[in-house]
Amino acid sequence: MKTVTALLLVSLAVVAIEGQHMKSQRCVCLGAGLNMVKPVLIEKIEILPSSPSCGHMEVIATLKNGAGKRCLNPKSKFTKKIIDKIEKNNRNAR
């Protein structure tokens, strides 16, 4: 009986550790994000689609000169125009 109890505790510990691993994969952006960033400051744009760990799309702008990353509001006009341009470029590249 003690062996079964010990195995059960070890199994629960493994499940708890695996469950915690999934919690670390959450949304990158906190809040809605910025409505606009000066286009000349943008080096790269990343679009992260919604997923089981984050229920909404995220748009992340990497800024030039090591100024960091900024989350953009996917619902803003500015961000929608950027997404449209990226999608258009992807279609033309095919």
From Swiss-Prot:
A cellular component annotation (GO) from this entry: extracellular space
Q: What induces it?
A: Up-regulated in response to bacterial infection by S.typhimurium or M.marinum.
- Intrachain S-S bonds: C27-C54, C29-C71
Any idea where this protein resides?
Answer: Secreted
Q: Does the keyword Nuclease apply?
A: no
Instruction: Report the record's Gene Ontology biological process terms.
Output: defense response; immune response
**GO molecular function terms noted in the UniProt entry:** chemoattractant activity; chemokine activity
Keywords from UniProt, A to Z, are: Chemotaxis, Cytokine, Disulfide bond, Secreted, Signal
Which parts form a coiled-coil structure per UniProt? none
Primary localization: secreted
Q: Where is the signal peptide?
A: 1-19
Q: Which domain of life is it from?
A: Eukaryota
Purpose? Ligand for cxcr3.2. Chemotactic for macrophages.
What protein family does this chain belong to?
Belongs to the intercrine alpha (chemokine CxC) family.
Tell me the protein's name: C-X-C motif chemokine 11-1
Q: Name the source organism.
A: Danio rerio
Gene transcribed to yield this protein = cxcl11.1
